[in-house]
Amino acid sequence: MVMEKPSPLLVGREFVRQYYTLLNQAPDMLHRFYGKNSSYAHGGLDSNGKPADAVYGQKEIHRKVMSQNFTNCHTKIRHVDAHATLNDGVVVQVMGLLSNNNQALRRFMQTFVLAPEGSVANKFYVHNDIFRYQDEVFGGFVTEPQEESEEEVEEPEERQQTPEVVPDDSGTFYDQTVSNDLEEHLEEPVVEPEPEPEPEPEPEPVSDIQEDKPEAALEEAAPDDVQKSTSPAPADVAPAQEDLRTFSWASVTSKNLPPSGAVPVTGTPPHVVKVPASQPRPESKPDSQIPPQRPQRDQRVREQRINIPPQRGPRPIREAGEPGDVEPRRMVRHPDSHQLFIGNLPHEVDKSELKDFFQNFGNVVELRINSGGKLPNFGFVVFDDSEPVQKVLSNRPIMFRGAVRLNVEEKKTRAAREGDRRDNRLRGPGGPRGGPSGGMRGPPRGGMVQKPGFGVGRGITTPRQ
């Protein structure tokens, strides 16, 4: 059977997940990702106010990491890019936010070059590492509240398979599927204009991996090729948290630490990443979808992030040539049955011209044109009675200037508009939302697709089938 070589994106995402988890749990072990020829440049200024120079070699990198005083370090990954580079290496670029010692989150960018270790196929170590804070480069301190890092759980669109620690005589093994999801965020640049958007598969999903104890909140998008799924499904947060309670990096690293707890630096082999070659995978078709449920905390945070302009009621429209009055005018509310929605208006249309046109059907008491920049424009016509409204509707199609067909509809009531939105949300792209719980979790355990595993100490492998 022909074995597939793991994609750079799969290698990069799994490396990112484990790197920032170790940064949170055991920063004194971080140097094991590097080798004797590795370089490490971390954001910061030297005594002269210039960007600090890079350090080289595992020993110097360990000193540099310890000088950063990483304590309770939380990371929110917004985006990950990974591409193949020279000599079968992988270059990984990470963008996100980092909080050290419970301080405010700061935006950062970090670039890794993963090079083949050489002794075994699909085994990597960090050859180059460059880290910069955005505020040190562009100025200005861009922050987000720290509580979001500890409490917020983004809504992933694929259920995440829980990690598992598998002991073996040859060392400690760690196996985890990369979560598939779709924000956005997000954040990918995650723009969510509506509190309840319809789920749509997107190429770069973003999720938060939030563990039960204060650990790195890792948001990352999984590659689309990990699982073929036609529609996204939100993660079941509670079971994932219950399973994660059994996992601790302390149990992983304690087997490789000396009794005193000190980390030997001299002569320590580089922490390498072994990525087993994946086998051809069978296509899996999801039989059911997980009912989407948005946590109230997540909903509240999303609404706070969106800058919602204050809603304004309809303003009375002045007649053409009417002098502007300085006194505030009283707003008059008209019944919906007296109003018409007018779409497909020419961009150069004049209010007086449009009003004269509709005066042929009845007395126009108010006319509004919305020209928000998107063509064609639209507006509303208000009559003094419901009879002209029905007269216009019965004479459709309405031709303006003899050539422009206007889209004329009766204005819907607020209850009708909310009912339409509710129906659209319940309908969704694949029928009514909901259905049996416990949908597809991704590739079945023991299946054909293997995820890269990472660990510390004597190298990295994955559990045997």
UniProtKB/Swiss-Prot annotation:
Q: What is its EC number?
A: 3.6.4.12, 3.6.4.13
As to how many cofactors bind and how, the note says: Mg(2+) is required for helicase activity.
Instruction: List residues modified as Asymmetric dimethylarginine.
Output: R427, R433
Which major enzyme category is it?
A: hydrolase
- What positions does the domain RRM occupy? 338-413
Location, primary (coarse class): cytoplasm
Ranges of compositional bias, category Acidic residues: 145-157, 184-205
- Modification Phosphothreonine, positions: T143
> What keywords are annotated for this sequence in UniProt?
Acetylation, ATP-binding, Cytoplasm, DNA-binding, Endonuclease, Helicase, Hydrolase, Immunity, Innate immunity, Isopeptide bond, Methylation, Nuclease, Nucleotide-binding, Nucleus, Phosphoprotein, RNA-binding, Transport, Ubl conjugation
Q: Where is the composition biased (Polar residues)?
A: 248-257
The segment annotated Disordered runs over: 144-330, 411-465
Q: How does it assemble?
A: Homodimer and oligomer. Component of a TAU mRNP complex, at least composed of IGF2BP1, ELAVL4 and G3BP1. Binds to the SH3 domain of Ras GTPase-activating protein (RASA1) in proliferating cells. No interaction in quiescent cells. Interacts (via NTF2 domain) with USP10; inhibiting stress granule formation by lowering G3BP1 valence. Interacts (via NTF2 domain) with CAPRIN1; promoting stress granule formation by lowering the saturation-concentration of G3BP1. Interacts (via NTF2 domain) with UBAP2L; promoting stress granule formation. Associates (via RG-rich region) with 40S ribosome subunits.
Which function does this protein serve? Protein involved in various processes, such as stress granule formation and innate immunity. Plays an essential role in stress granule formation. Stress granules are membraneless compartments that store mRNAs and proteins, such as stalled translation pre-initiation complexes, in response to stress. Promotes formation of stress granules phase-separated membraneless compartment by undergoing liquid-liquid phase separation (LLPS) upon unfolded RNA-binding: functions as a molecular switch that triggers RNA-dependent LLPS in response to a rise in intracellular free RNA concentrations.
Its recorded name reads Ras GTPase-activating protein-binding protein 1
- Give the source lineage, highest ranks first: Eukaryota, Metazoa, Chordata, Craniata, Vertebrata
